[in-house]
Amino acid sequence: MGPLQFRDVAIEFSLEEWHCLDAAQRNLYRDVMLENYRNLIFLGIVVSKPNLITCLEQGKKPLTMKRHEMIAKPPVMYSHFAQDLWSEQSIKDSFQKVILRRYEKCRHDNLQLKKGCESVDECPVHKRGYNGLKQCLATTQRKIFQCDEYVKFLHKFSNSNKHKIRDTGKKSFKCIEYGKTFNQSSTRTTYKKIDAGEKRYKCEECGKAYKQSSHLTTHKKIHTGEKPYKCEECGKAYKQSCNLTTHKIIHTGEKPYRCRECGKAFNHPATLFSHKKIHTGEKPYKCDKCGKAFISSSTLTKHEIIHTGEKPYKCEECGKAFNRSSNLTKHKRIHTGDVPYKCDECGKTFTWYSSLSKHKRAHTGEKPYKCEECGKAFTAFSTLTEHKIIHTGEKPYKCEECGKAFNWSSALNKHKKIHIRQKPCIVKNVENLLNVPQPLISIR
């Protein structure tokens, strides 16, 4: 029997199999593989870092087998495991040493590891983890191959000491809470670290710590600014592959996240989550200044700028500042002359989408804004607002010269012309006025 290698305890997926896994299953697979590799190092087995581990640490897809290779023949176990497929019990034995590290819910003060488990079924923590990974593999093979033989399972113990433990049935480490036993002291050591909530992987830049090395690898990209995942359509880059996958939906136009209440679809799960609050009426984000509540934190952040008066978005052309980036984007069209919104009916173009929407009502005759007092309807909300002044008697437009007030801005503008005509002509230089040639007066 040859020395143990990482490939003896590894699971490999084809591209089709990988795409059948959901996010939770992929994370579980990644953690199990990384944990297996760390166990080999911990046991003193010198192994070079496999490509699979490098891919997992970088957040890449761990695809090592091609589709035609998977179909050509059933995947067999490497080296000395090539002759037999595994039984259900063998699979359980193989997973029990890694599942406990993944699921950290068995946290009790009186939990001590003195002897190991007889089987996965005895401990709820182990059983949940084993069933999760087993279902992950079973679902994948059923979708792709419809055959139980097309799956590689973790092999458990391969060195002579571990085989002796398995054959004799001696288990030295026990969990008092569930009566569960473990074959390895390393399992106890690792479990204690998880039970204590230890975060072994620390960032040298900022000191932030993580429980898993893959999480630290992802975090480091914040400091380096590395964005290895690039969109082929627009060139935009991301730090994580999951963010790139979400971004690609923009180009495809796909909206896979649908609201069960109203049927509206969204291209991002976070957008759907925010939308659901419309139906529930939930507004968890409250302004400390005025008490106004909002559905999302981003909306609250935009609102708070009203109180501070801050205008962080400045136009490079004219220096005008805005409190929202969207307003700056719209403003820039004045300088560029961009009129991107075109009417399909008459071909007229507009700088703003809102202007196009109002214009379209001229063709349709739609008047969606109705006065509750008299029932009169209008095409624009601003027109309705001005109309309501008739009923309230309000005169918000005041002349600075004489103090006279008006209910329309247009009426105020007309009124101002009276003051302009009444103002006398002031001559600053009398000499220039005297030097002006006078017309000849003829007396008949």
Swiss-Prot record:
GO MF annotation list: DNA-binding transcription factor activity, RNA polymerase II-specific; RNA polymerase II cis-regulatory region sequence-specific DNA binding; zinc ion binding
Main location: nucleus
Cellular compartments annotated: Nucleus
Positions of C2H2-type zinc fingers: 201-223, 229-251, 257-279, 285-307, 313-335, 341-363, 369-391, 397-419
Pfam family, one: zf-C2H2_6
Entry's Gene Ontology cellular component terms: nucleolus
Coiled-coil annotated spans: none
The keyword Transcription regulation is annotated on this UniProt entry: yes
Protein's UniProt keywords contain NAD: no
Keywords: DNA-binding, Metal-binding, Nucleus, Repeat, Transcription, Transcription regulation, Zinc, Zinc-finger
Domain KRAB residues, every copy: 4-75
Gene3D superfamilies, A to Z: 6.10.140.140, Classic Zinc Finger
GO biological process terms on file: regulation of DNA-templated transcription
Annotated SUPFAM superfamilies: beta-beta-alpha zinc fingers (SSF57667), KRAB domain (Kruppel-associated box) (SSF109640)
InterPro entries: KRAB, KRAB_dom_sf, Znf_C2H2_sf, Znf_C2H2_type
Family per similarity comment: Belongs to the krueppel C2H2-type zinc-finger protein family.
Function summary: May be involved in transcriptional regulation.
Name recorded for this polypeptide: Zinc finger protein 506
Gene designation per UniProt: ZNF506
